[in-house]
Amino acid sequence: MSDRIRVLLDGTPLLGSRTGVGRYTSALAEELASMSEVDMRAVAFTLRGWRKLRKVLPHGTRSRGMPVSARLLRRCWLRAPFPPIELFAGFTDVVHGTNFVLPPAVRAAGVLTIHDLAFLDSPGDLGPFDEHLPALVARSAERAAVVCTPTQAVADVVVERLRTPPDKVIVTPLGVDPAWFTARPPSEALRKRLGLPKEYLLFVGAAGPRKALDWLRKAHEATPDLPPLVLAGPGHARGDDRVRSTGYLPDVDLRSVVAGAAALVLPSRDEGFGLPVLEALACDVPVVCSDLPALREVTGGHATLVPFGDVEALGAALTGALAEPPSPATVAARRTHASSFTWRRTAELTVAAYRQALA
């Protein structure tokens, strides 16, 4: 084997609207494609639409789809390590499952990214397509030579809940795109198009039980002096004057909407990383979030942490975040902290995981 590592990356998260896993996969692919020690290809585990992968990958990256449906593949892989990925995509040194599931392989070393294990405690949150996800993730972790996690908090849960040996787990923190550090509040045209008020609190993320928006809504309703709440992401119902929804936003609009917020709030019941909190810190926006191990780790003392489910405490924290502008020293500290998370570092640690898997 040459020093250049042949990597087959699961690019399925790049298709459709990108939330957390899609943004991770996109940034990782961009960095890997620029590294001389990596020869990257991508595969999409979908029977339809996989050709769109070519349009969203870094220039010149080869890709292919699978001649069978993802649902059928998952059913097969749940029962046995067949069909192997080489049957469809040819030989490679490493196959990287970027989205919880690792395809079986005959010869390739397996690297698996587990973003969180929230579904183990709340299986009812899973959709019909993901009903077998807990078993698939457990099988994938057992099959993998290395498991990557975004935080040490998730690594600890993987070791405890999946009984994965600690020396098999590598923490590969996510990164903050440099564009966040120069983001500016939305223009009048963008405010008008999205229906943004002059002052607003912001939640960024897809709708779902894990995000605990019911807790946020209760705290917001119980504190009438707070500005309107804006929900940015897919799946949110239309609101009213006090709660507004933008739907899914492209990156350039999202950066402006975050930069213009009075504060960003992430009230999640569980998080593996919480990328929006770092992105908010990068553009000088105060952060209020649940007091969870991963969020404590990621925010590093630069956010207001609230006990999960405490309505009064959340309302008070949001009020406090708006009370007075941060000092220049506080702003500088937030930005310095956010700047320590780079996608290049994510890729370098991931390549280290590939080399460990091949050792």
Residue map of PLM features:
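Carbohydrate transferase catalytic cores enriched for Leloir-type hexosyltransferases
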Residues: 1-359
